[in-house]
Regions:
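Active-site microenvironment for binding and transforming phosphate-containing groups
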Residues: 1-168
């Protein structure tokens, strides 16, 4: 069943209507699932590096609070398959953007293994799952599960833009 969508280009959807299935598509970006058992509400978020820098987790929790009365402490969160830190090289420019959202201590955990990339510039390995886990914790979510599945390393079963390019 398809319903008309009054939106385009969003990185999150939510409902509290039983029987409605929400679907989001991801490549190497993370799906973040928020479930509020007290209000029978769910949200699905698309957390790429840009969404993570913009703290889509807090934005999703705030939308749920306003719409359903959700409290972060009641939320059960799940982080789905996405690219792992070992496979996700990012630039110094991306790291600088993250520094606007995360503390120095968190930055040391999220960005590891500084090295020179093929372009001769400084690059880092980014742990996107850990970054979103920290955002969830900082927002007050206490129950967080992360399956730890890397899309890049499992590209035969899951789509990975970095492993497969644009073909789907």
């Amino acid at each position: 069943v398809r319903f008309p969508r009054p939106y385009d280009n969003v990185d999150g959807i939510m409902t509290n209507v039983p029987g409605i299935t929400l679907v989001t598509y991801h490549a190497d970006c993370l799906p973040v699932y928020l479930y509020d058992p007290a209000h029978q509400a769910i949200a699905l978020l698309h957390a790429g590096w840009r969404g993570t820098v913009d703290n889509i987790v807090s934005a999703g929790l705030e939308k749920m609070r306003k719409a359903y009365g959700t409290r972060a402490s009641d939320v059960i969160a799940g982080i789905g398959p996405g690219i792992s830190a070992a496979c996700y090289e990012t630039s110094e420019a991306v790291r600088i953007l993250f520094a606007e959202t995360f503390t120095d201590r968190d930055m040391e955990r999220i960005f590891t293994e500084p090295h020179l990339g093929e372009d001769g510039a400084r690059h880092w390995q980014l742990d996107l799952a850990l970054a979103n886990h920290l955002l969830l914790q900082n927002a007050g979510v206490q129950e967080i599960s992360d399956g730890g599945i890397c899309t890049y390393r499992n590209a035969k079963r899951l789509f990975s833009h970095r492993a497969q390019g644009a073909k789907r």
